[in-house]
Each structure stands twice: as structure tokens, then as C-alpha cells.
Amino acid sequence: MGHSDNTNDGGILVPSIVEQPCGLYAGTEAFSGDYDADDYHDWVEQSNGDPVPAPLVVYLQDAACVDQRDQERAMGQELRMQGALFDGDRVLEQLILTGSIAETWSENQLHHLVSTIQASFPVDRQSLNNWCACVANTIPSGERLRLLRVLGFNHIRFALTASAPEAQLAITLADAVRQAKRLGFDRIILDLRRMPADTTLRNLLQSLDQKTKPDRIRMPLVGNQDPGIYAQAVQAIGFRYIGLDWYLCEDDSWWDAWKNGSLYWTMLGYSELHNPDVIGIGPGAISSVGGCYSLNDAPLSDYVAKLKQGRLPIVGGAELEPADLLRREIIAMILTSSCIRVSRLEEKWGIEFDRFFARESDRLRALERTNQVSRKTDGIDIHAQSQPQLIEICEIFESRPRHGSAAAAHTPSSKHVPLSKSYIVS
């Protein structure tokens, strides 16, 4: 069992739940091998001391292995160690299961896992509204959906592939959505990024109706094909586009948040939680606390060994400078507000935007000529909507661009101590 859909960034397998490429500024190429658990402890302590501590989010991912017992025990140990670091009054506000945990872990394993989570972090009734189980390899049975609901999961995310025959896929998905609605799942999410943009996808979308439609749909990148073919299929049943291939129903809380400016951007993508501390549990997981990222050991044997020694399995990470935090804030503005609030940034950061971002401003002026952006008195409006265009604009503000990006030719990457060769994926 495991998560085969992780993405490779600079030789590191990035967890599939982490938003690529705009969620992990400035990419794992900025990660350093001299960042360790002591640095992570310092950032957690700083976060605990904030007048209004950040919301807490935990996601869990597993690794491919024959015997899950060592992995299950190790992940439980990591949960307890992480929970002990954070102040006891900081409620866990979102929980996400990824990898194959929701699909293939046994009923006893899942019950034990949830018990460990609740013993490690404070959980209240409100936070249970944000428990999400992600399933990626198969559409779960009714019994599995019922178990997840009993355990407290209120959101279910189906990440479909084209492995099943077209007709069977549409019928099975419709049955699963109906069952999830009957069981009381509050949010049903359909992630189609691994579906090829062909007639199978179009027919699948057209098979949805008011009784079987999910609450959110993530569409794939459609390449050279006309995205209108796919957009029309979902818009016909009431979905609205917000950006980065996300379509929402108008009664979705994300839609209201997007309209009133309270939808935020995090390492995990769009969220109603503002600037949360994200704790990744499991082999190869990445955490984001304050201005730092930390990376867990990925080989399962090394991950388990460190936890048996009573150590967090952190093997690297990055600490962002103030300029990095400024750039990350601009990227979030682009993706959530379709604008760059220049006046607000100048007041908050004490900069003159066009001088501080002289090179970036030149590139934005070039995009004005193609009507992708436009200047106004106090800011810059973003008119681009497609994923490639939005990513191109975000990359303008990457001071430490990832390998192969459009910005890589303009700015050299920062120097750092490389990660252990045993970690890097060739």
C-alpha cells in the first residue's frame, strides 16, 4: 500500500496533498540538510508564543510496505511527539488522511489511529467538520464510507484515474456519491487531475446530475484542447470557477469565502483557515510551521528507526527570510484575490513596490500587453484564469525558482547544504 501519485520536485518526492507548484514556495530545492528537529522545535515554540497562534492542520500519509504494523506504531509515536510540542489549548482544526490510509488500513488500525490523534491534539465538535479522507486508487465500498463517517470524517475526496472502464466508472462514482450523501458527508470532492482529458472525462462529467454531483470538482490541465468542453459540462449543473482548475457549487462555503476575500492559500492549497501551521505525519511528509518547512525521512526503515530512538524523523528543511515571506504573500494574493494589493504591501512591509520588485514589474508590464494583468492606482488586477497563466505570474515572484521553471533563467537558486544522498530520489 502507499501513495504512488507523489510528485518529484528537485529529486524529492513531494506528498500528493501538497499543492504543486505554487504551494511550497520556494520549492524543495531550497531545502537544506543542516535544518533539523532542533530548528523545528524553535519554530513551534515561536508559534506557541504568538498572541493569536495559527490554526493547526494535520495530514497523514503512509508508505508502501508489506507489514503495516511498524509503520502504524511509528506514525502513532510521531503524532504523540508532535502533539506534545504544541500548547495544549491549540485545537486541531483540520485533519486529512492521504496515501492509502483511508482505503486499505483495517478497521482496527483506523480506530486506533483516530484514538491516537484525539489523545495527541485537542479536538472539538467544530474541528470535526474539517476531517477529510482522500481516496485515490479505488472508489470505496459503502461499508468503507460508513466506517469513515463513523470515525468522524465529514469530507471525502475521490481522486479518480482512468483505470476503470468508462461506463463502470460513471456508475460506481454515482453510487458512491449517493451513499456519501446518505451517510451525511458534508463535502464531497471530485479530483480529476489524473484523468486524461478525453471523451472518458467529458462523458463522466456529463453523467453527473443534481443527485450525484459532488460539492467541489478539481479539473485536470487540458493541454491544447478547448477547456470549454469540460467547463460547460460542470457549469451546466451549477458549478462556478474560482481558479487553478477548481469548480464549486454556489452553496459551498469556499464560494462565499472567495467572494468576500476570506479564502486563503496554504501549502495544501485553498483553505478557509488563515496561515495555518501544517503538520505532516508519515514517511516523506513535509510540515510548514510559521516561516519554516521541515522534511521527514522518506525510507520507511529510516523513518521508523528515528522514532524508535525517540527522535522526530526530520532530515531537512528551509527557513524563509522576510523577503521570502513577502513573496509568498504576493503569490497567495494572486491565487485567492486575483490581484496584488500594492498599497497594502507597501504599508505592511515598508517597501516601494516598483523599486523593490523592479525586475518583476518589468515582466508584469509585458503581461499587460496581452491583457493578463492591468495596473490600477493601488494595485495590480490579475485577469488570467487558466492554471498555466496563473503559475506563470506566480513564478515571476519566485526569488529561488524551482528547476525548470520560467523564472529559473532570471535568478540563481540559493546555496544550501544538500540533503543526504540516501533521501534523494534518482
Model-derived features: positions:
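A short, conserved structural fragment
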Residues: E368-D378
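Structured loops at beta-to-helix junctions and adjacent beta-edge loops in soluble globular domains
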Residues: Q61-A63, I281-G284, Q385
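Short amphipathic alpha-helical interaction segments
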Residues: E352-A366
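Flexible, acidic/Gly-rich N-terminal and inter-domain linker regions that tether
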Residues: M1-Y59, A63-C65, R73-E78, Q82, ...
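Short, amphipathic alpha-helical interaction segments positioned at domain boundaries
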Residues: Q387-S426
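Extended hydrophobic-aromatic, low-complexity segments
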Residues: V342-R344, R355-F357, E392, S405
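Minor-groove-contacting beta-hairpin "wing" of winged helix-turn-helix DNA-binding domains
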Residues: G379-A384
